[in-house]
Regions:
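A short, Trp-centered hydrophobic/proline-enriched beta-strand micro-motif
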Residues: 38-53, 93-97
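Active-site-proximal "nucleotidyltransferase
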Residues: 14-47
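Short, structured beta-strand-loop surface elements
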Residues: 83-149
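C-terminal edge-of-domain segments
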Residues: 9-27, 138-191
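Short active-site oxyanion
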Residues: 69-74
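Compositionally biased low-complexity segments, especially N-terminal hydrophobic helices
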Residues: 1-8
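A positional/architectural concept
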Residues: 55-62
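Short His-Asn-centered micro-motif
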Residues: 76-78
């Protein structure tokens, strides 16, 4: 997969997304995330939403660096960025994944925290990050944002053509049409 990039302050879309994803689904702590990983496998840029001090919501694009088997999402960030300050005041965030061509929409409610764990930074590091962190893994401003998933809502449609045909059939027959799948995933409490 080619490397891609987005914005400043660690808000990026690096190569190597979803590194370390587990395919094991028999563990009750892991199974809920199987559907989530399937839905987001090809979505590389997300929107992370935090709450500002004045109460307004603030969203910015981020690149998911990893989705752990326990549902933790990892993002690189600058530890002096505005989002970090917002998270210190309110840890609840939303992460949105959208793939409009396939009619996939995922909304993740989670609890965010900042990590300066150098071992984890080295594990998730990719050279494209030097664009924002010129000193590499030793950049003193480099940190990780961890989002622990609280709940996931998703909508998955059959695609544009099938959706249009179902809408047309519904208009002609006057009966509502189920155009896609909606679901909520609430992971079990961590043990």
């Amino acid at each position: 997969m080619p490397a891609a990039a987005a914005g400043p302050m660690g808000e990026m879309s690096p190569a190597g997304y979803h590194a370390g994803m587990s395919t094991q689904i028999d563990d009750p702590q892991i199974a809920p995330f199987s559907k989530f990983r399937d839905l987001t496998a090809d979505i590389h840029v997300t929107m992370l939403t935090t709450r500002r001090a004045d109460g307004l919501l603030h969203s910015r694009p981020m690149g998911t660096r990893a989705i752990e088997s326990d549902g933790a999402l990892w993002f690189f960030t600058a530890d002096d960025s505005g989002k970090v300050n917002e998270i210190y005041h309110d840890q609840m965030v939303n992460v949105s994944y959208i793939k409009p061509g396939d009619q996939v929409y995922v909304s993740v409610a989670g609890k965010a925290s900042l990590s300066r764990d150098r071992a984890k930074i080295r594990e998730l590091w990719t050279p494209v990050l030097k664009t924002w962190f010129s000193e590499g893994v030793d950049d003193p401003n480099l940190a990780l944002l961890r989002v622990d998933i609280v709940a996931i809502d998703y909508w998955e449609g059959p695609g544009k053509i099938v959706s249009l045909l179902k809408f047309a059939k519904s208009a002609v027959t006057g009966t509502p049409s189920k155009v896609g799948e909606y679901g909520t995933i609430v992971p079990p409490p961590k043990t």
